[in-house]
Amino acid sequence: MVYNEWQRGDCTISTERARLDLHAIHEFLSTKSYWARGRSFELVQRAVENSLPFGLYRGARQIGFARVVTDYATFAWLADVYVLDEFRGEGLGKWLVEVTLSHSELQNLRRWILGTRDAHELYRHFGFVEVERPEFYMHRMDAGAASTPAPPEATGGGE
């Protein structure tokens, strides 16, 4: 599998999926993040499998993470960005976002979006702004299958 790596001092950012420590990612997201608290390991694993992941490492230890959900043509969602507390203040989060946004497969997209409660200044540095016309945007929060209506029944087709 083809992957990219970036080096800065003793830190590396890599898109190599085999290098990701899914247990460490799950631990942070499910217990320390405000946006994914309580998320199951299986859900984290599925999210990573269906995204472009960026692992941040100091030596062999994973110390941060980001992922991009995209169609690689027009749209990308930057999600689950974090750096462990003990490594903050070194510019690693800024570097992680910079590398993610500059990835060769993510250039010339029409729109990037993200959600944040506390890192507005970080993302403003990269050109993100608050939504100017929120009346154009909607979202749907789905607590789980119990609140999701059954899909319409498919009818025949094909040959």
Residue ranges with predicted function:
Residues 94, 106-141:
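Conserved active-site alpha-helix within GNAT-family acetyltransferase domains
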Residues 40-82:
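A conserved beta-strand-loop-helix scaffold within acyl/acetyltransferase catalytic domains
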Residues 4-10, 129-150:
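Short, basic/aromatic-enriched C-terminal tail that caps enzymatic domains
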Residues 1-39, 149-159:
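Short amphipathic alpha-helix that is part of the acyltransferase structural core
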Residues 87-96:
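Conserved acetyl-CoA pyrophosphate-binding loop and the N-cap/start of the following alpha-helix
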